Swiss-Prot record:
Main subcellular location: cytoplasm
Organism lineage: Archaea, Methanobacteriati, Methanobacteriota, Stenosarchaea group, Methanomicrobia
Catalytic reaction list: IMP + diphosphate = hypoxanthine + 5-phospho-alpha-D-ribose 1-diphosphate; GMP + diphosphate = guanine + 5-phospho-alpha-D-ribose 1-diphosphate
Entry GO terms, CC: cytoplasm
Species whose genome carries this gene: Methanosarcina mazei (strain ATCC BAA-159 / DSM 3647 / Goe1 / Go1 / JCM 11833 / OCM 88)
Protein name per UniProt: Hypoxanthine/guanine phosphoribosyltransferase
Subunit structure: Homodimer.
A Gene Ontology biological process term: IMP salvage
CDD domains, alphabetized: PRTases_typeI (cd06223)
Length: 189
């Protein structure tokens, strides 16, 4: 179950940014090259465990796009990308997001009250981006049927529970100076 993903995470190089051990991985960074078989493994697994009775697959640019696009191609469900710049379209929703290492503004277009969506993201660590996104979607009246993160690090996912959302994290990791340790795999009971 998710063997390519687990193996690739364990082999991830680690760099130090201040006191933070940062892992470099194709799914979270696009470096090194993104293996299409890895993306296929991930999208296949998501299609099995997620509520796919939705109108749209939603992801935040940039690194959620490869997996969300593969899932869209596999299921035939349209893909909507939350962008980091405005397009000034009617109905565009602006939201501020803050993570442990950055702050920014995101823009949602093309969604309306009553839409049913699944959110697919590459990594959840602090939970800041997904928390702001889910709040904005709930304000619009969009039904968040599922939240999927390929990789989880830390306990930022707990913040989503405050909004009634229980994210599914495919692989939960811990990152130390010596490397990535797999802590849990979704569905591995």
């Amino acid at each position: 179950m998710l063997e390519r993903l687990k193996d690739s995470l364990i082999r991830s190089p680690i760099i130090k940014r201040g006191e933070y051990n940062y892992f470099i991985h194709p799914i979270s960074d696009g470096v090194p090259s993104i293996d299409p078989h890895l993306v296929e493994e991930i999208s296949d697994y998501i299609s099995e465990i997620a509520d796919m009775n939705v109108d749209t697959i939603l992801t935040v640019e940039a690194m959620g796009i490869p997996v969300a696009n593969a899932l869209s191609l596999k299921t035939g469900i349209p893909l909507t990308i939350v962008r980091k710049r405005p397009y000034f379209l009617e109905g565009e929703v602006e939201l501020s997001q803050s993570t442990g290492y950055s702050k920014g503004v995101l823009y949602i277009n093309g969604l309306k009250k009553g839409d049913r969506i699944i959110i697919v993201d590459d990594v959840i660590s602090t939970g800041g981006t997904l928390l702001a996104l889910v709040r904005a979607l709930q304000t619009i009246g969009v039904e968040v049927m599922d939240v999927i993160s390929v990789i989880g690090r830390g306990d930022g996912y707990l913040k989503l529970r405050e909004l009634g959302v229980e994210p599914k994290i495919l692989v939960t990791i811990d990152v130390g100076e010596k490397g990535v340790e797999i802590k849990d795999v979704f569905g591995n009971q």
